[in-house]
Design a protein with these regions (language model features):
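Short basic (Lys/Arg) and small-residue
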Residues: 66
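Helix N-cap motif at beta-to-alpha junctions
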Residues: 70-73
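Short N-terminal secondary-structure initiator segments
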Residues: 1-11, 75-80, 84
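Flexible, gly/pro- and Lys/Arg-enriched active-site loops
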Residues: 37, 46, 52-61, 75-185
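N-terminal beta1-alpha1 ligand-phosphate binding loop
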Residues: 2-38, 44-50
Length: 185
C-alpha cells in the first residue's frame, strides 16, 4: 500500500542556461520536472538575457519560468532540481558563473523559509527582471509569500534597461527550430 499524497502546493521554478546547447538544457529541465511526477501547469515564453554578476565574458542566458503543482515537500523539490542540474553537468565553482542548467525554486506555496538548506521565496527574485518578466507571463497575480505583493506589482518596481531581455519564442518546448538560441561554449 502506498503512502497517501501530501497536500498540493503550487510552486514557481526559474530555468536558465548559458553553456552548451542552451535550448536543450532548459527543455531537459522541464522534462525532468515532469518525469518526476510534478504537474507543470504553465511555462513562460523563452527569453535571452545578459548575464548579471559573475565573471566577465559569459555568454547570454536563456531564461524561462514554470508554474507547477506538487505533493512533494519543498526540500524534495529542491533536491530534485539539484539532481537535474547535475545531470546536465552543472558545476558550482564560480558564484554567478556560467552554467549548463540553473533551476531555482522561487516560490513554494505560502512557505517562507530562511534556512540555509532551503531559502524560499528566493531572496533576490523580486530584484531581477530576468526572473520576474517570465514569472509575470504565467503568474502575474501570484502573491509573494514574504512581501505580500503580486508578482506584477513587484515587476513594476524594477527599472527597465533597454536590451536586458529579448523575448525569443512562446513555443520553445515544441518548436524544433533553434533560431537565436544557438549554442555557447
Amino acid at each position: 500500500m502506498s503512502e497517501p499524497a501530501g497536500p498540493v502546493s503550487r510552486c514557481l521554478i526559474a530555468l536558465g542556461s548559458n553553456l552548451g546547447d542552451r535550448l536543450d538544457n532548459v527543455r531537459a529541465g522541464v522534462a525532468g520536472i515532469e518525469a518526476a511526477g510534478i504537474d507543470v501547469v504553465a511555462v513562460s515564453p523563452l527569453y535571452e538575457t545578459a548575464p548579471v554578476g559573475g565573471p566577465e565574458n559569459q555568454g547570454p542566458y536563456l531564461n524561462a519560468a514554470l508554474l507547477a503543482d506538487t505533493t512533494r515537500a519543498a526540500a524534495d523539490v529542491l533536491a530534485l532540481l539539484h539532481r537535474l542540474e547535475a545531470s546536465r553537468e552543472r558545476q558550482r565553482v564560480v558564484h554567478w558563473g556560467p552554467r549548463t542548467l540553473d533551476l531555482d525554486l522561487l516560490v513554494y506555496g505560502e512557505l517562507v523559509s530562511e534556512a540555509a538548506a532551503l531559502e524560499v521565496p528566493h531572496p533576490r527574485m523580486h530584484e531581477r527582471r530576468f526572473v520576474m518578466v517570465p514569472v509575470c507571463d504565467i503568474a502575474p497575480d501570484l502573491v509573494h509569500p514574504r512581501l505580500g505583493r503580486t508578482m506584477r506589482d513587484l515587476l513594476a518596481d524594477l527599472p527597465v534597461e533597454p536590451g536586458d531581455l529579448t523575448r525569443l519564442t512562446d513555443t520553445w518546448l515544441t518548436d524544433t527550430r533553434h533560431g537565436a538560441t544557438h549554442d555557447h561554449p
